[in-house]
Amino acid sequence: MKSFNIDHFIASVLQWILNIALIILSIVLSIFLINETITFIQYIFSAKKYTSYKLVESIIVYFLYFEFIALIIKYFKSNYHFPLRYFIYIGITALIRLIIVSHEEPMETLLYAGAILVLVIALYISNMRDLRKE
């Protein structure tokens, strides 16, 4: 007869809650992605001229949604594990968006660029670790 393991039960329940929350989040993000696609198409075919910053910001927000959805897909495909490099990709993309949208203060822009450099170095180190495993 199997004994009841409370630790395993709690972990299983929490894993189910996390999975359901991530599925709901992926549905919401997919809706936002579709909305961003429609907005992007409207920018392209609109007679009104939008600034290139607005268009580039729209594209980067689109990729942020896309990266978060890809991260959730990877979570389920890799046995409930979030790979570090996907978070780094999202961080780099978000910082690039910040530089494009908010570039009035040179010192802030320099700090964002430095943060991107740190993330790229972290990505390189992470990838080197993965290459050594192979």
Swiss-Prot record:
InterPro entries, alphabetized: P_starv_induced_PsiE, P_starv_induced_PsiE-like
Chief location: membrane
One example of a Gene Ontology biological process annotation: cellular response to phosphate starvation
A UniProt-annotated Pfam family: PsiE
Lipid bilayer topology: Multi-pass membrane protein
Subcellular location: Cell membrane
Keywords, comma-separated and alphabetical: Cell membrane, Membrane, Transmembrane, Transmembrane helix
NCBIfam families from the UniProt entry: PRK02833.1-3
Family designation: Belongs to the PsiE family.
Name of the protein described by the UniProt record: Protein PsiE homolog
